[in-house]
């Protein structure tokens, strides 16, 4: 593969006007080292970088591109809407269709509010939970990332595992006062006993528990059914709001989201990524009595100039229609499992300590023995070995997430030929680590 000379020059240029040369930290390749690839275009399961090099894409814009890049029906829907202007700042029929679609696909959502980012969704859901309960304390879990709102930047996984000191139960970012995060209690992921103790001591103070039912921002870590069941029971018993952050898992692991896989009904759900089809879109919704506290009906304020943006809604509604096809998620899950099983077999043949797991169209690669079940176990992965593997795969034309602490994503366009090309690359790459 040729040297990414155009990406090198673009990165040098970008750093003059953009902090770190990127608009989201993980894109800078700081975790893995080297120069980030600047992308010129994408189609199906492929990216083309600024030098014209084609790459098999397992990032998928960090999850949204579940039907592949530039799907013709999604592109056509956006083009048709764009001809009538990009934004109105007023209600549209299309956003009603989006809301109806979300409520139909996710039974726990009785009403929904559209926003523009996952951070807005989680931030607003927590404000709503506090307004509804009249309480302040929020419970989150180590390694779960819920966006970059101040009160949630505590042991938050994702890029913060690369950029922050994770040994302290303190803000994971400069600029976040300790007075802000004092209302956030951080507990170990998958530890139901710790959650029971927290409720025993602080049950009357806890407004909400927020969780990724499948964590995707400390690599991929599944919640156990017992953990989520205990969480649901404790929230019900103590009058706290259970919030599932399904910004990443929503519609990617199942048509009914992770809550359908586990059979757990949250009070509020946060969505994003897939519901925008690659455009900036997110949402939060749930029980009607809770959602009724939102302005203009209630006293909990939330607003957004571009909320329900027509272009994003068009892309999202079309994507949701495509993935609602019979068998879509069964095929996606089977293909993703085929990918991780194949990679695990190749690593085993190469004698490399390695494990892999998948849920729906998400997957995790771990340079360690055994699939991790907690934040602590994830941080025991061999980051140096992952970094070497990442660069070896990139040199072979396979683009993985540039961090040992991020999940990967498969689209419906990753067919057997794409997987076999990935396996051929991996056979050579594992020899380099």
Swiss-Prot record:
Gene3D superfamilies: Aspartate Aminotransferase, domain 1, Type I PLP-dependent aspartate aminotransferase-like (Major domain). Its main location: cytoplasm. Pathway: Porphyrin-containing compound metabolism; protoporphyrin-IX biosynthesis; 5-aminolevulinate from L-glutamyl-tRNA(Glu): step 2/2. CDD domains: OAT_like. Its cofactor is pyridoxal 5'-phosphate. It is found in: Cytoplasm. GO terms for biological process: protoporphyrinogen IX biosynthetic process. GO terms for cellular component: cytoplasm. InterPro entries: 4pyrrol_synth_GluAld_NH2Trfase, Aminotrans_3, Aminotrans_3_PPA_site, PyrdxlP-dep_Trfase, PyrdxlP-dep_Trfase_major, PyrdxlP-dep_Trfase_small. Keywords: Cytoplasm, Isomerase, Porphyrin biosynthesis, Pyridoxal phosphate. One of its GO terms (molecular function) is pyridoxal phosphate binding. The keyword Cytoplasm applies. It catalyses: (S)-4-amino-5-oxopentanoate = 5-aminolevulinate. It comes from the Bacteria. Its EC number is 5.4.3.8. The modification N6-(pyridoxal phosphate)lysine is found at residue 273. Homodimer. Belongs to the class-III pyridoxal-phosphate-dependent aminotransferase family. HemL subfamily. This is Glutamate-1-semialdehyde 2,1-aminomutase. It comes from Ralstonia nicotianae (strain ATCC BAA-1114 / GMI1000).
């Amino acid at each position: 593969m040729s040297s990414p000379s155009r990406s090198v020059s673009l990165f040098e240029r970008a750093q003059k006007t953009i902090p770190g040369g990127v608009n989201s930290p993980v894109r800078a390749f700081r975790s893995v080292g080297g120069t980030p690839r600047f992308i010129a275009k994408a189609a199906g399961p492929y990216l083309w970088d600024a030098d014209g090099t084609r790459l098999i894409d397992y990032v998928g814009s960090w999850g949204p591109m579940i039907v592949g890049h530039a799907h013709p029906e999604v592109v056509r829907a956006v083009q048709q809407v764009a001809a009538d202007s990009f934004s109105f700042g007023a209600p549209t029929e299309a956003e009603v269709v989006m809301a109806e679609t979300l409520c139909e696909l996710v039974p726990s959502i009785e009403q929904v509010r559209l926003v523009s980012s996952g951070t807005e969704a989680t931030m607003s859901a927590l404000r709503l939970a506090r307004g509804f309960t009249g309480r302040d304390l929020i419970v989150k879990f180590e390694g779960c990332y819920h966006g970059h709102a101040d009160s949630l930047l505590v042991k938050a996984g994702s890029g913060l595992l690369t950029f922050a000191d994770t040994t302290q139960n303190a803000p994971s970012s400069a600029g976040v006062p300790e007075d802000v995060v004092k209302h956030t209690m951080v507990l170990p992921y998958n530890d139901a006993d710790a959650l029971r103790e927290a409720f025993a001591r602080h049950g009357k103070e806890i407004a909400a528990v927020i969780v990724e039912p499948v964590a995707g921002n400390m690599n991929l870590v599944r919640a156990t059914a017992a953990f989520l069941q205990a969480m649901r029971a404790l929230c019900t018993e103590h009058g706290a709001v259970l919030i599932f952050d399904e910004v990443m898992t929503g519609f990617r692991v199942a048509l009914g989201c992770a809550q359908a896989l586990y059979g757990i009904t949250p009070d509020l759900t946060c969505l994003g990524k897939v519901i925008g089809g690659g455009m900036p879109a997110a949402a939060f919704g749930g029980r009607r009595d809770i959602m009724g506290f939102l302005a203009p009906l209630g006293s909990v304020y939330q607003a957004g100039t571009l909320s329900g943006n027509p272009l994003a809604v068009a892309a999202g509604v079309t994507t949701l229609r495509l993935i609602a096809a019979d068998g879509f998620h069964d095929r996606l899950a089977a293909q993703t499992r085929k990918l991780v099983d194949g990679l695990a077999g190749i690593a085993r043949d190469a004698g490399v300590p390695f494990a892999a797991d998948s849920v729906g169209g998400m997957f995790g690669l771990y340079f360690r023995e055994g699939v991790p079940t907690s934040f602590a176990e994830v941080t025991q992965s061999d980051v140096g070995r992952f970094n070497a593997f990442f660069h070896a795969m990139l040199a072979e034309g396979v683009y993985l997430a540039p961090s040992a602490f991020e999940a990967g994503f498969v689209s419906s366009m990753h067919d057997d030929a794409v997987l076999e090309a990935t396996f051929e690359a991996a056979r050579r790459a594992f020899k380099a680590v």
